[in-house]
Curated annotation (Swiss-Prot):
Subcellular location, record wording: Cytoplasm
Known role: Catalyzes the reduction of the glycolytic intermediate dihydroxyacetone phosphate (DHAP) to sn-glycerol 3-phosphate (G3P), the key precursor for phospholipid synthesis.
Residues at the catalytic site: K193 (proton acceptor)
Gene Ontology biological process terms in this record: carbohydrate metabolic process; glycerol-3-phosphate biosynthetic process; glycerol-3-phosphate catabolic process; glycerophospholipid metabolic process; phospholipid biosynthetic process
Example GO molecular function: glycerol-3-phosphate dehydrogenase [NAD(P)+] activity
EC number: 1.1.1.94
Catalytic reaction equation(s): sn-glycerol 3-phosphate + NAD(+) = dihydroxyacetone phosphate + NADH + H(+); sn-glycerol 3-phosphate + NADP(+) = dihydroxyacetone phosphate + NADPH + H(+)
GO cellular component: cytosol
Protein name: Glycerol-3-phosphate dehydrogenase [NAD(P)+]
Keyword terms of this UniProt record: Cytoplasm, Lipid biosynthesis, Lipid metabolism, NAD, NADP, Nucleotide-binding, Oxidoreductase, Phospholipid biosynthesis, Phospholipid metabolism
Gene of this entry: gpsA
Length: 333
């Protein structure tokens, strides 16, 4: 039997995931602040602003701009808001979400200023117990999901029964969720791979080839694994769909905003210029400094994140970034 599911945020990924939920037989309500998006989904089953490639969204998808109306009957509430705005946005929903509802995060990022993961931000904002929070992460490029190409993901919750409920609610013929209790690992994978994607994109944009990309990706994986384990994650998580899988998809596709943003930097655009031509938020940009700060907090070296922070804050070139990443000491891998 289908559930009542609300998706907070009608961006490309939120809308694509809403379609997955609708295809799985649920009644889906999208919440958005933009009246144009609300009316488009509600009246025409089309999100012309954020996901124009899908000509007709399922009939069992609707939309509202009213917070209370959006969540009042929800069994599951999915959060698909830009990570750095999550806390401010979610506070407005505190006390509105039903006590039985599971809250699921699609967000990927580390909050600037607090160095907190999205699971921490969501739970604090909504005063939510850990067993009612779940996160979803994996190699899930929104356009491919929207086109219903076969894909898999991982659902994490400290309560495995609740993880399974969420997974069942988003299982379709083309979308396969797996479950885990490693919330920390899943969150760290989703956040930190965006920084790696920025660096790979920058190298590609600057004209470097496969060797350079592979070097950045593998060192990025080592960096995010070390940081994740220090935060309490299971190292195995980093070698599954949420880790290596997401890294491969994000670092190798022009559909990835982080990769594309980095590529524009590599071609010589400034951060401001790359931001203007970006279609949506490249979460790796605000996350980079937060990753460096988190590494300092956990006493874990983050050379890739540090060099990318220099790119973003000081405007160093790709060659300077790579030179800084290499260093001069001979070390063990």
């Amino acid at each position: 039997m289908g559930k009542n599911i609300t998706v907070l945020g009608a961006g490309a990924w939120g809308t694509a995931f809403g379609q997955v939920l609708a295809d799985a037989g649920n009644t889906v309500t999208m919440w958005a602040k933009e009246q144009q998006i609300v009316e488009g989904i509600r009246d025409h089953h089309h999100n012309a602003v954020r996901l124009p490639s899908v000509e007709k969204l399922p009939d069992n998808m609707t939309a509202t701009g009213d917070r209370a109306e959006a969540v009042k009957n929800a069994d599951i509430v999915v959060v698909a808001i830009a990570a750095q705005f999550a806390r401010v946005a979610l506070v407005e929903f505190k006390g509105l979400i039903p006590d039985h509802a599971i809250v699921v995060s699609l967000m990927k990022g580390i909050e600037r200023g607090t160095n907190k993961r999205m699971d921490e931000v969501v739970r604090e904002s909504l005063d939510l117990p850990a067993d009612r929070f779940a996160a979803i992460s994996g190699p899930n490029l929104s356009k491919e999901i929207a086109d219903r190409h076969p894909a898999a993901t991982v659902v994490a919750c400290t309560n495995l029964d609740n993880a399974t409920k969420v997974a069942e609610a988003c299982t379709t013929s083309y979308f396969k969720p797996f479950v885990t209790t490693d919330v920390i690992g899943l969150e760290m994978c989703g956040s930190l791979k965006n920084v790696t994607a920025l660096a790979v994109g920058m190298a590609r944009g600057a004209g470097y080839g496969e060797n350079t990309a592979a070097m950045i990706e593998t060192r990025g994986l080592a960096e995010l694994t070390a940081l994740g384990v220090a935060a309490g994650a299971d190292p195995k998580t980093f070698f599954g769909l949420a880790g290596v899988g997401d890294l491969i998809a994000t670092c190798g596709s022009s559909l990835s905003r982080n990769y594309t943003f980095g590529a524009n930097l590599g071609k010589g655009l400034t951060v401001e210029e790359a931001t203007k031509v970006s279609n949506g938020v490249a979460e790796g940009v605000p996350t980079t400094d937060a990753v460096v700060a988190l590494g300092n907090q956990l006493d874990v070296p983050t050379p890739l994140a540090y060099q990318m922070s220099r790119v973003l804050n000081e405007g160093i070139s790709c060659s300077e970034m790579l030179a800084g990443l290499f260093g001069h000491e001979v070390t063990g891998e």
